[in-house]
From Swiss-Prot:
UniProt xrefs under InterPro entries: DNA-dir_RNA_pol_helix_hairp_sf (IPR024075), DNA-dir_Rpol_C_phage-type (IPR046950), DNA-dir_Rpol_phage-type (IPR002092), DNA/RNA_pol_sf (IPR043502), RNA_POL_N_sf (IPR037159), RPOL_N (IPR029262)
Role noted for this protein: DNA-dependent RNA polymerase catalyzes the transcription of DNA into RNA using the four ribonucleoside triphosphates as substrates.
Entries under Pfam families matching the protein: RNA_pol, RPOL_N
SUPFAM superfamilies per UniProt: DNA/RNA polymerases
Annotated protein name in UniProt: DNA-directed RNA polymerase, mitochondrial
Gene3D superfamilies: 1.10.287.260, 1.10.287.280, 5' to 3' exonuclease, C-terminal subdomain (1.10.150.20), DNA-directed RNA polymerase, N-terminal domain (1.10.1320.10)
Species whose genome carries this gene: Neurospora crassa (strain ATCC 24698 / 74-OR23-1A / CBS 708.71 / DSM 1257 / FGSC 987)
Length: 1423
């Protein structure tokens, strides 16, 4: 029975709450149908319902910004408000005792099978299919989804009603477009069916208004009267007046008709109908005048755009030569050229920034939207040009580009056939497997048109193959994901454009029919405020479409790829070896094969050899157009996906697939204003204008077109001396060695070619932008580090790209600027460890070399090529020479960015945190006459250690004596602070030793790898000595991080208790079919680990800028997805996935430091902007004009001091204590202790098991926290393992500390057993290294090296003993020896006991005596 809403006897306040509560505010997405022009996205994202309606005068955040947002304790909202005069660059106060906490209330529903109608069983996928069906007008399919949701009874009533309203909205819109009695009857039947299913649904004004609109289409007056009366009776008069009549659904004429049919809803007696009609007519005239004015403005804009056409058409050819294409002529390079083709029509010297802003934005929008359209137009034009020349494009031609048009047309035809098949599959009563697949992916491919889908499929397929190596092919799983992502992105762009047009039309219509400004109703006692409240209740809050699920992406991508494989053909022309005639043969362009990889059969797409040859010559850029530099300042960041590019939605946070938790925290922080400083900082970085350095570009272009190798530009045709192939009669090992050498050469050749291809793109973009002012929009990673979004050309690029960059805005040098310009020259040359005066003198002493480099860069003495950064050196030479040409060089207007680099910035932060005076001196935190060099200091300590070993006649010391230089230790010292492990450090040292001493193995008789291990031990020991305070902090960070990763929060404990008391009683959800990666643990000894696998917590903290950081490392589950090509096992990332404890622990200290240096950079950017400085940054390298360097350096020091003047570590400890308050963690204690023996006796007596022990401890802690003294007393009397631990270990902490070998500075580790131990722990963790994307750090290290596992510790001489043993024993004998030793020591192995304890953290390490305020006078902090 349908419940009636509360009676009209309620107070106005209660009525407003009823009105607000009758309909939840849900996310919105665009719709091609619908009265309101927007559809609610899905209720799966809704986690909280606001009990107080927001003010209609304030712009409300998108619902996802408040998903799961809860305030615990006192939040920032309770703190004193920041005054309006507080500068942005000042740190905002926040209470670490009240951290932002997000609870994701998204329910995990039991997954069902796809039903016989082809409706998926996953609730999230049902929502997506429902939205897609409404979008493409397949309302009968949408009705089937609604029916299944109702049958499963998994959606709350209010959310289900909102879904029904969306369906009703679309049905009514369809009825109005095509009036039909049957369609109207379907609407009424659908409502009655919903009412009669027994669910109590809170029907509100929106539902009634839609039903009334459908009723008014009836041609029978009696039927119309009956329906209108019936639907209005569902709501009391007062509620109907405030909701139904205040929606935007019913027009004035329809409201008048309803009032005629039901007189009690008529206008008040004191309103004259003639006066009312006259007012409406006047209002419509005003709206019409406004529309005409708007049209005139639009016309004037169009005319102004036409008027600039002559400016954009040059009659003379450009003076800048074309960029010589690396034998890739055609597809890849031509695509770049086509993408930036609009610049080719602009005469030299014309800057788009001189146009009005509206025209600049129009050009930028065109640039962003030009990707697929440019490809289609280019393919079509080339095909037509070949046809005009009488060439057959199906025959063997030298360019893949000539075939793409035919591929596109054939694929377009196949997709049209596919859509017909989808429609048939939806209609057939008995569906087979293919029909069910089509029913799922059909609504999604219908959202685009076949022409665009075909182009997107071809572009994404070729780009994926080209990026991964065409000759190797690509796995089906990665390829279909790549295709589906780009198809999804393209569909979103099309929907966004349609939504903008629909909004404009809707606004025009609503302004013509808006009687609510003068309309008042009889019996309405609500105040104006309540009327506004009712209006605000009906505002559709729009948000971004929810991303497709992995299953939907897989099915869509597989369907598109399968269609491409069926249609893409390549025609080969070959000569018959016998008859010498030409034979034409059609072959598939791609093949689907199964390959063995690591013992598993993997579906792979292999291109035809002819296609591979073309792809090698013609690499394909990856949707380049949407990620070019902007020609207008980026839009300011205002929400998670609103900012930067004008047309392309880009998230402010760089996320991997499925990282939902970081997004939830970020959106919650945005909602309460915590991201304001980060947003403003990104805006500052983005608004910095750039231009191309023309003199350097011309030199670079000459080098490029010559095909020679100069600086870091590889040669066009590299020459390698190939070793002669050994005779077939020789030893097979010789042949294997020859093949290995050939492979190395081919890999190097391929690497140089790839490098040149990428540079080709960069130079083509630089040529297109050579006269333009352009901008790099920025976003951040999960730690808060800022990165430019355009990936191909930006100031974070290699030396040749940085050499091309100039600030668009120039500033006179002045005395200070001239001095810093000279210092910068010395820095980029490599003379950067001298004093500032010595660096200035270096430039003065090389004036002739500088002038020669400028006047004759390629044929002179080429002094600039000897620099550490030659292209940046050349750019500085041009700038300095131009200044010196003036009578007064200080008056020269300089555009060159001057860099100020930190001295191992991570160690600077660690030294400040730990208070290490010695360490602070080595990283220039302490004032000095000359710059300190931490790398040289570490090298000296290593040399001293080797000399000590030499005195003991150590053979390794003899081999390395006199061979330790600054360069050998530099990379290891630099990366140590960022989590480099022993394995990664050893690789770094080995690379340096082999480069400097290639014959060291032959000379010393010791393998270079063993010598690298020896040196690495000394480096790590030196680091731990120099940075003792930092070492202690890393230990502390690792310990608290490890405890958090083994903890259960109160919410998780409650969930665990509910699952234990459920009928299943196994702690898992019924019907769950996702399995965790790794080996399941079935032994009873691992019950606690099973609990943790389901409920582990990730490490979360807040940066000084109040940005929440959520570490993303989890062990994702897998799911088998059936597609039209093959069954695929796909990774399914979920927020509920257990964390990868090993990576969480290892990554915490370096990520924490990264979050500090990111905060330092943003604060510096904000302060520089306040002072009017131009600012750019490359992590810990900050750039500005030469004349502003002194000001920027003062800002950098001030920001660092402000960050570290606060108790950063103390605040982190307080935040963790608050964030993980009342949690329990799984601790380990040694079995030989007294407390362990008592616990074992208790367990023997009680026999509870791990699960019940956990529940027992949960109950005990709740009683102890109770405000009831009796409960507290009961808790004190309870006996549990934790209470026994508290009783017997009150004097000291007996828990086993975390294994921190992977975490701390100066970590020493052994050499062998790495792979064995690593493999064993990987099995235990259930993690496969290859499953994570490799994240390259600025030092060139990859994440797998930074987070590699560690072998066992080695202290003192034990490391040398083992190295000697390794040298003198073969691998097999060593393995046998260690296996026996392991068995022999089995009885002595330590055993541990697991117990659940309240989560507490160890005390903060004592800080050293370094005072960070002394930094204020340090000249070389950044220099």
């Amino acid at each position: 029975m349908l419940p009636r809403t509360a009676s009209a006897t309620r107070t106005p306040h209660l009525n407003r709450l009823v009105s607000a509560g009758s309909r939840r505010v849900l996310p919105r997405c665009s719709s091609s149908l619908g009265i309101r022009g927007s559809l609610a996205a899905t209720p799966r994202l809704l986690s909280t319902i606001t009990t107080q309606q927001p003010s209609p005068l304030k712009r409300q955040p998108a619902p996802r910004a408040t998903v799961g947002f809860e305030r615990h304790l006192a939040t920032v909202l309770d703190e004193p408000a920041q005054t309006a005069t507080t500068p942005l660059y000042e740190l905002r106060s926040f209470s670490p005792q009240a951290p932002l906490t997000v609870r994701d209330h998204t329910k995990v529903y039991a997954k069902q099978r796809v039903n016989y109608h082809g409706i998926p069983g996953d609730v999230n996928e049902m929502f997506l299919v429902f939205e897609a069906c409404l979008q493409v007008g397949r309302l009968e399919r949408a009705a089937q989804v609604l029916k299944r949701l109702a049958n499963l009874d998994v959606v709350p009533p209010a959310d289900y009603l909102d879904l029904f309203n969306q369906y009703l909205d679309a049905k009514v819109s369809q009825l109005l477009q095509e009036p039909d009695v049957d369609k109207a009857d379907d609407i009424h039947k659908a409502f009655e069916t919903m009412v009669s299913d027994g669910r109590e649904l809170p029907v509100g004004g929106e539902t009634v208004a839609l039903l009334l609109k459908a009723s008014l289409t009836s041609t029978d007056p009696e039927t119309m009267q009956r329906y209108v009366t019936r639907y209005l009776s569902l709501l009391p008069t007062q509620i109907a007046l405030e909701t139904v009549f205040n929606t935007e659904i019913l027009t004035y004429e329809e409201l008048t008709k309803v009032a005629e049919l039901c007189p009690k809803y008529n206008m008040p007696d004191n309103v004259d109908p003639d006066t009312f009609a006259q007012q409406q007519q006047q209002q419509q005239q005003q709206q019409q005048q406004q529309q005409e004015q708007q049209q005139q403005q639009d016309t004037s804009i169009d005319q102004s755009e036409v008027s600039i056409e002559p400016l954009l058409t040059s009659s003379e050819p450009s003076a800048i030569p074309e960029v010589l294409g690396t034998p890739q002529k055609g597809f890849g390079l031509q695509f770049v050229k086509r993408t930036v083709s609009m610049f080719k029509d602009i005469p030299d010297g014309f800057d788009i920034s001189t146009l009005p802003m509206s025209q600049q934005r129009e050009i930028q929008s065109k640039l962003e939207k030009d990707c697929v359209d440019a490809s289609l137009a280019r393919w079509r034009e080339e095909n037509e040009s070949l046809q005009k020349m009488g060439l057959n494009t199906s025959l063997d031609t030298p360019s893949l580009n000539s075939r793409l048009y035919q591929w596109q047309k054939d694929l377009e035809t196949r997709l049209r056939t596919m859509l017909v098949e989808v429609e048939k599959s939806e209609m057939v009563s008995k569906k087979n497997k293919d029909d069910l697949d089509r029913c799922i992916y059909g609504p999604f491919i219908r959202q685009s048109n076949p022409e665009r889908l075909a182009a997107v499929t071809i572009i994404s397929t070729l780009s994926s193959l080209a990026m991964g190596g065409a000759h190797k092919g690509s796995t089906i799983a990665s390829l279909i994901t790549h295709i589906a992502k780009f198809a999804e992105e393209d569909i979103r762009v099309q929907k966004a454009e349609a939504l903008i047009s629909k909004r404009n039309l809707r606004k025009a219509k609503s302004k013509q029919h808006n009687p609510r400004s003068v309309l008042r109703f009889k019996n309405s006692t609500a105040s104006a405020g309540s009327s506004d409240m009712a209006d605000s209740n009906n505002v559709a809050v729009e948000m971004d479409d929810e991303a497709w699920t992995t299953t939907i992406r897989t099915k869509v991508g597989a369907a598109l790829l399968s269609a491409l494989l069926d249609t893409a053909k390549i025609t080969l022309v070959r000569e018959d070896p016998v008859t010498k005639t030409l034979i034409t043969q059609n072959q598939p362009a791609f093949s689907h094969v199964m390959q063995l990889r690591k013992g598993k059969k993997i579906g792979t797409i292999i291109p035809n050899k002819a296609v591979v040859e073309l792809l090698v010559r013609e690499p394909v850029p990856d949707f380049l157009a949407r990620h070019l530099p902007m020609v207008t300042p980026p839009d300011p960041w205002v929400s998670f996906e609103k900012g930067a590019y004008l047309e392309t939605k880009t998230p402010v946070l760089r996320l991997k697939n499925g990282e939902r938790e970081q997004r939830l925290y970020t959106e919650a922080a945005i909602a309460r204003g915590d991201m304001d400083q980060v947003f403003k900082g990104l805006d500052v970085l983005g608004k910095t204008g750039w231009k191309i350095n023309s003199p350097v570009f011309k030199v670079m272009l000459d080098v490029w077109n010559s095909g020679k190798q100069v600086a870091n530009i590889p040669p066009l045709d590299p020459i390698f001396d190939l070793p002669p192939e050994p005779a077939s009669t020789e030893d097979p090992t010789v042949k294997r060695a020859w093949l290995k050498e050939i492979k190395v050469i081919e890999n190097e050749r391929s690497g140089l070619h790839s490098q040149r291809c990428f540079m080709n793109f960069q130079l083509e973009i630089a040529r297109a932008y050579r006269d333009q002012t352009f901008y790099f929009p920025h976003n951040v990673d999960f730690r808060g580090r800022a990165y430019p979004i355009p990936p191909y050309l930006n100031h974070m690029g290699a030396d040749h790209v940085r050499g091309l960059m100039l600030f668009a805005k120039g500033k006179p040098l002045g005395e200070s600027g001239l001095r810093w310009l000279k210092v910068h020259l010395a820095n980029v040359y490599g003379f950067d460890k001298a004093s500032l005066q010595e660096r200035q003198d270096f430039a003065d002493e090389n004036i002739e070399n500088i002038r020669d480099s400028v006047n004759n860069p390629l044929n002179g003495n080429q002094w600039w090529l000897q620099a550490e950064d030659p292209w940046q050196c050349l750019a500085t030479c041009f700038e300095l020479a131009a200044a010196l040409e003036l009578e007064d060089p200080t008056k020269y207007v300089s555009h060159l960015p001057i860099h100020q680099d930190g001295t191992c910035n991570g160690l600077q932060h660690y030294a400040a945190l730990g208070g290490d005076t010695w360490g602070a001196q080595q990283v220039n935190l302490v004032p000095g006459d000359r710059p300190a060099d931490v790398y040289s200091a570490v090298a000296k300590l290593v040399i001293k250690g080797i000399e000590d070993d030499l005195a003991k006649d150590n053979e390794f010391a003899k081999a390395m004596h006199g061979k330790i230089t600054r360069k050998v230790v530099k990379q290891t010292v630099m990366t140590n602070v960022y989590g480099v492990t022993y394995v990664g450090a050893r690789k770094q040292v080995l690379k340096q030793i082999e480069a400097a001493y290639p014959n060291i193995t032959a000379e010393s008789g010791i393998e270079a790898a063993l010598l690298a291990s020896y040196v690495t031990q000394h480096i790590f020991r030196a680091m731990s000595t120099m940075f003792k305070g930092a070492h202690d902090i890393q230990n502390w960070l690792g310990e608290i991080g490890g405890r958090v990763c083994r903890a259960l929060t109160p919410e998780q404990l409650d969930e665990f208790e509910r699952s234990e008391r459920s009928p299943h009683g196994d702690g898992t959800a019924s019907g769950e079919n996702i399995t965790l990666a790794g080996n399941p643990r079935k032994s009873s000894a691992h019950k606690n680990d099973e609990i943790l696998n389901n409920f582990q917590s990730t490490i979360i903290w807040t940066t000084p800028l109040r940005m929440p950081v959520v570490q993303p490392y989890r062990k994702h589950g897998t799911k088998t997805v059936s597609t039209c090509m093959q069954d695929l096992v796909m990774t399914i990332p979920e927020r509920s996935d257990p964390v990868n404890r090993r990576k969480q622990l290892q990554a915490f200290p370096p990520n924490f430091i990264h979050s500090l240096d990111a905060s330092h950079m943003i604060l510096s950017a904000l302060h520089c902007d306040e002072l009017g400085l131009t600012f750019a940054a490359v992590h810990d390298s900050f750039w500005t004009h030469a004349s502003d360097i002194d000001s920027m350096n003062a800002v950098l020091r001030d920001a660092f001091i402000r960050i570290h003047s606060e108790d950063v570590i103390g605040r982190l400890a307080a935040e963790f204590q608050a964030r993980y308050k009342n949690s329990l963690y799984l601790a380990k204690i040694e079995t030989g202790t007294k407390v362990a023996q008592e616990i074992q006796r208790w367990r023997v007596r009680n026999k509870l098991g791990p699960r019940k022990e956990l529940l027992l401890e949960k109950e005990r802690q709740e009683l102890l926290r109770s405000s009831n003294p009796e409960d507290v007393e009961r808790g004190k009397k309870m006996i549990s393992p934790a209470s026994l631990y508290e009783l017997y270990s009150s004097a000291e902490d007996l828990t086993v500390p975390e294994d921190l070998k992977e975490v701390t500075i100066g970590n020493l580790a052994g050499v062998e057993e790495t792979k064995v131990r690593r493999g064993r722990e990987m099995d235990e963790e259930g993690e496969v290294d290859g499953s994570e994307e490799a994240v390259e750090h600025e030092d060139g290290m990859h994440e797998d090296e930074m987070l590699a596992d560690e072998p066992r510790d080695m202290d003192g001489n034990s490391g040398l003993d083992e190295l000697s043993e390794l040298r003198n024993t073969n691998h097999f004998a060593l393995s046998q020896k260690r296996a026996k030793a392991s068995i022999a020591s089995g009885g002595k192995q330590k055993h541990y006991l697991d117990i659940w304890l309240p989560l507490v953290f160890p005390p903060i390490p004592e800080k050293g005596d370094f005072d960070v305020r002394s930094l204020k006078d340090s000249t070389y902090f950044f220099s």
